[in-house]
């Protein structure tokens, strides 16, 4: 009996000790919107995730804005095999199926959400001012670039600039393009005057893209007005655009940004010989072809040099296969290149 009472007393003591403990429920492993980004490394990882969306779209290039724009233009012709209905329909500005570009829509909004998340949290990270401005500028550029492609392809797409938006509203054309232009202007203003060469965008990339977006919105897109109701006499391109922050962007300001890019960026056109832009003039093969041998040609990217004409390029490698890593190789080249050696 005494033994039983003694054991019960021990058990009661143990249970009392357990109930008096405080359970630490904080998750030290999983990253979420509540704890990420919190460090400089987190910010770098988050920015890499936004860039990764460029490769994600490359996994299914036939769904992308670039693919449709190329086939709809005079730059190339729709080809492929007899069963490539998707590509043939794009070439004729037709639908092959209802969700033919759905993957592009999903991918680009995923990239936008990643940009929103980083921009929402970057103020909570202790960063040097120049580093913070560079990261914030790159995130704003990429968000603007993704919206630019979506708006160019679909028109008035839902607009969200915060990761907390659950049901974003459909903006007017002026609101949507105002946000695109504001992001690009902000990126050009805050990023340091340092040219990037590692696949990242810089101040001058933002200035150039600002000019491109301005020309499309006030030119080809006719300020977002009803194209059917416009004529050459009734259409008047905008000379200023109201931005969401209450400021105004003028045509003269855009010209100033472009002039800064041309005069101060270090980017330039290759004027020596057009063929120097193409890889067949590299020092290992330039003498292999009758049309290049003995002509003093030199590829602009020989010896790891950077093409002076390239302001912004998606980074690819040669390691991708047909699995989930396919987007890390230039899958556009697979579609636009020579189909086979047999003719």
Residue ranges and their predicted role:
Residues 17-20:
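C-terminal motif of bacterial Sec signal peptides marking the signal peptidase cleavage site
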Residues 1-8:
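Bacterial N-terminal signal peptides that target proteins for export
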Residues 10-14:
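Hydrophobic helical h-region of N-terminal Sec-dependent signal peptides
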Residues 26, 151-161, 226:
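Short, well-structured active-site flanking segments
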Residues 122, 162, 314-316:
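Active-site-proximal beta-strand/loop segments in catalytic clefts of secreted hydrolases
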Residues 35, 39-62, 80-154, 164-200:
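Conserved, well-structured interaction surfaces
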């Amino acid at each position: 009996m005494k033994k039983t009472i003694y054991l019960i007393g021990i058990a009661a003591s143990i249970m009392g000790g357990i109930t008096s403990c405080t359970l630490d429920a904080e998750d030290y492993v999983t990253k979420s919107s509540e704890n990420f980004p919190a460090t400089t490394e987190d910010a770098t990882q988050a920015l890499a995730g936004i860039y990764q969306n460029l490769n994600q779209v490359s996994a299914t290039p036939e769904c992308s804005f670039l693919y449709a724009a190329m086939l709809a233009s005079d730059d190339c012709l729709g080809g492929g095999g007899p069963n490539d209905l998707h590509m043939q329909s794009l070439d004729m500005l037709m639908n092959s199926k209802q969700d033919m570009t759905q993957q592009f829509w999903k991918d680009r909004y995923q990239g936008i959400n990643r940009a929103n998340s980083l921009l929402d949290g970057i103020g909570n990270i202790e960063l040097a001012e120049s580093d913070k401005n560079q990261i914030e500028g790159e995130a704003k550029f990429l968000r603007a670039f993704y919206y630019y492609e979506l708006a160019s392809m679909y028109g008035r797409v839902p607009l969200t600039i915060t990761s907390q938006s659950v049901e974003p509203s459909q903006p007017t054309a002026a609101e949507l393009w105002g946000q695109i232009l504001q992001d690009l202007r902000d990126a050009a203003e805050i990023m340091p005057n340092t040219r990037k060469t590692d696949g990242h965008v810089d101040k001058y990339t933002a200035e150039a893209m600002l000019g491109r977006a301005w020309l499309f919105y006030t030119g080809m897109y006719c300020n977002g007005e009803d194209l059917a109701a416009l004529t050459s006499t009734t259409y008047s391109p905008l000379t200023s655009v109201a931005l969401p922050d209450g400021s105004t962007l003028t045509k003269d300001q855009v010209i100033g940004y472009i002039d800064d890019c041309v005069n101060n960026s270090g980017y330039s056109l290759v004027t020596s010989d057009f063929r120097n832009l193409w890889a067949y003039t590299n020092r290992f093969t330039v003498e292999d072809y009758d049309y290049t041998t003995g002509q003093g040609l030199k590829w602009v990217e020989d010896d790891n040099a950077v093409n002076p004409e390239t302001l912004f390029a998606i980074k690819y490698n040669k390691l991708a296969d047909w699995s989930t890593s396919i987007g890390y190789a230039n899958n556009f080249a697979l579609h636009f290149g020579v189909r086979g050696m047999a003719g």
